[in-house]
């Protein structure tokens, strides 16, 4: 029996065209059992399915369909559900939010700040709407806060730690003790209490806040329920940084960027190793001049000419910023936004009118961090269909996959949130999202190399081109219909209000790696490329990758005393590793496919493909990153303006300058390679490989919880590109 189990485990559940599947799965979705063994893919399928069946009261037929589609890698529940679904932790109402990819919150009170820290600590992406009509409901700042730290993290022995925060108020002496608790809620209460002190009328304009972190467990200690390890490394500086922001606003209300900084300072505390684990979206009114330039000149030069980040605004990098237009933007507004995004990746705009039209309600234009969900004070749970695993000729398999995804998201509508604003939103406007990934791969298989060549030509409206577009539309509209019918049928049978929009496309950067799909609707970087994934040095998963034959190099951040990149991953100065994975898309060897230059696809061609998805499949919004070169800025701006002006369905999209110069940006997450280079790398991997069983290789090195346990708040591979520093 044991031998049979080992044989099952040794057989890879992931396709050969997905070399990143093993490292991503074991780093991101595999939990450690109490007995010490780490979950294999089938274990995760068992756990998450059990949780869905229990929560969603699924029929046997629904259970069997969801199970088959997940095990066949055709339809998967959300990344958050893959991590926490079916655990005892996930069944407690205070932890329900941990099962959701993302949220949006209107910032109207101090509690909103605490809620967003709580959400970030559970792995949720946090959207915050920071328009005047919301933040002007916050009280005027009246008290100057002086912070004194008492006690070091980890001082109290485990058996004597407080779990809940304790607040001792001495109003007569204008003094408050904030004893942070060793729990998520304990962190949140200590943070929210400090903010509330700034407007507390029990004090006469000045208050001393004594913050005690003695009861907080030290870095590296296991988080038993959620999984992973504690990392309070940035918590001690949070309170003074927040006090500085609040003290700067005495006598007035906070402006939008001060609110943003308070949220982002808390988000910055949610880290694993030195890697960001939170993701955010901050929405500002289009007329908010303070917000418009908030990220400009973040880099500053010191007297020696060295560039550094402005420390008072560093936390702004934790989130994407979007300007919300409630009236259609002018052509000049759009051009300026496209120019700014090309230069810095920032400056995105959102047309709220289309969001409210789709959502069928005023104020329902709040966005999650990657911009694919629209609503107000919402939670969203996303399932994902892997189209690269499904034959374009097999309509039944397509329908089954989209039905399974719809059932998986509908099941979570049974959650009753503790927080009233989120529960009210769910009752009035329930939110689900069924996304897909690998649509580009699917189209290549459906329409052949001729479709690829037509894409390379710019997707012109020739007779053949119009035929291709009609076929794309037919697939997209049918899938949309299947999803909505399935969700609505489930809701009707369970007496749940029907969501009025159920389809979206997320960035799909992480789960796509499990099957080797080109993320979301996007084209791949190339037919063949090196995919580099960051790990801390000596990470057990990275060590297993070495045993499996993959090469490891130092990261871009590891340099010698002269500023040169290190070459030896075992150099004592090296702190992070890049595992290098040779990748070939599964259609790369179709006759003629190699000759198509994917990196030359125009911005307008990408935008045209994206709008096909936005018009014919997506009911929420389509997360999009259109890559462009400088000469494409004006034509793309004109096209976006037209799409808004003509009510074509456009809401928002991200734009990214193409990174063509590998020398300027060495060791990129994606580096195109030739077929010969790919085959040479693959041969070298096989020669170095000492085991065919990745799970067994990991068990040899895996002595405890991984630092980076569970998916991060953002699922986009676009966030991996290097930040442009001033030259």
Regions found by a protein language model. Name each.
Residues 1-727:
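Extended catalytic cores of very large enzyme megasubunits
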């Amino acid at each position: 029996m044991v031998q049979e189990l080992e044989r099952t485990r040794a057989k890879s559940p992931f396709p050969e065209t997905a070399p990143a599947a093993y490292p991503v799965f074991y780093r991101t979705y595999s939990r450690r059992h109490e007995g010490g063994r780490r979950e294999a893919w089938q274990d995760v399928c068992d756990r998450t399915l059990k949780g869905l069946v229990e929560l969603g009261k699924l029929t046997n037929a629904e259970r069997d369909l969801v199970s088959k589609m997940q095990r066949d890698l055709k339809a998967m529940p959300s990344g958050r559900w893959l991590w926490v679904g079916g655990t005892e932790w996930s069944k407690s109402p205070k932890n329900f939010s941990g099962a959701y990819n993302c949220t949006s919150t209107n910032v109207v009170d101090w509690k909103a700040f605490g809620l967003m820290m709580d959400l970030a600590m559970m792995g949720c992406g946090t959207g915050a709407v920071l328009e005047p009509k919301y933040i002007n409901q916050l009280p005027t700042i009246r008290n100057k806060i002086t912070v004194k730290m008492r006690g070091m993290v980890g001082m109290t022995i485990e058996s004597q730690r407080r779990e809940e925060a304790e607040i001792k108020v001495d109003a007569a002496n204008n003094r408050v003790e904030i004893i942070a608790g060793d729990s998520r809620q304990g962190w949140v209460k200590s943070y929210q209490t400090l903010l509330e002190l700034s407007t507390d009328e029990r004090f006469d304009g000045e208050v001393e806040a004594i913050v005690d972190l003695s009861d907080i467990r030290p870095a590296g200690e296991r988080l038993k329920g959620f999984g992973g390890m504690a990392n309070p490394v940035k918590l001690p500086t949070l309170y003074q940084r927040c006090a500085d922001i609040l003290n700067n606003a005495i006598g007035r209300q906070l402006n939008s960027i001060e609110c943003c900084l308070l949220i982002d300072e808390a988000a910055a505390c949610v880290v694993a190793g030195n890697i960001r684990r939170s993701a955010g979206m901050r929405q500002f009114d289009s007329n908010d001049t303070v917000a418009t330039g908030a990220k400009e000149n973040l880099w500053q030069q010191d007297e020696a000419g060295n560039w550094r980040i402005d420390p008072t605004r560093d936390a702004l990098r934790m989130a994407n910023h979007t300007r919300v237009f409630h009236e259609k933007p002018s052509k000049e507004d759009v051009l300026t936004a496209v120019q700014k995004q090309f230069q810095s990746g920032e400056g995105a705009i959102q047309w709220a009118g289309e969001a409210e039209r789709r959502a069928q309600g005023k104020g329902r234009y709040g966005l999650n961090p990657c911009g694919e969900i629209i609503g107000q004070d919402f939670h969203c749970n996303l399932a994902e269909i892997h189209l690269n695993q499904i034959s374009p000729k097999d309509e039944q398999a397509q329908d089954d996959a989209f039905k399974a995804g719809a059932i998986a998201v509908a099941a979570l509508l049974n959650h009753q949130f503790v927080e009233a604003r989120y529960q009210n939103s769910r009752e009035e406007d329930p939110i689900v999202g069924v996304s897909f990934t690998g649509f580009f791969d699917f189209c290549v298989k459906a329409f052949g190399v001729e479709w690829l060549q037509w894409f390379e030509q710019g997707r012109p409206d020739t007779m053949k081109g119009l035929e291709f577009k009609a076929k794309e539309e037919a697939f997209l509209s049918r899938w949309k219909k299947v999803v909505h019918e399935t969700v609505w049928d489930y809701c009707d049978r369970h007496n749940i209000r029907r969501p009025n929009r159920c389809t979206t496309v997320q960035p799909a950067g992480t789960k796509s790696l499990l099957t080797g799909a080109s993320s979301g609707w996007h084209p791949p970087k190339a037919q063949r490329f090196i995919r580099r994934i960051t790990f801390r040095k000596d990470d057990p998963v990275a060590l297993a990758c070495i045993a499996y034959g993959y090469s490891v190099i130092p990261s871009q951040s590891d340099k010698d005393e002269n500023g040169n990149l290190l070459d030896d991953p075992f150099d004592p100065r090296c702190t992070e590793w890049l595992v290098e994975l040779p990748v070939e898309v599964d259609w790369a060897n179709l006759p003629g496919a190699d000759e198509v230059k994917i990196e030359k696809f125009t911005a307008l061609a990408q935008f045209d493909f994206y709008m096909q998805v936005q018009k014919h499949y997506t009911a929420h919004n389509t997360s999009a990153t259109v890559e462009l070169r400088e000469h494409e800025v004006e034509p793309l701006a004109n096209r976006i303006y037209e799409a808004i002006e003509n009510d074509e369905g456009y809401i928002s999209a991200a734009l990214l300058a193409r990174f063509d110069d590998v020398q300027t940006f060495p060791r990129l997450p994606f580096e195109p390679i030739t077929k010969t280079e790919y085959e040479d790398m693959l041969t070298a991997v096989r020669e170095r490989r000492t085991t065919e069983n990745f799970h067994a290789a990991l068990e040899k090195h895996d002595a405890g919880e991984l630092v980076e346990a569970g998916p991060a708040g953002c699922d986009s591979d676009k966030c991996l590109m290097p930040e442009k520093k001033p030259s």
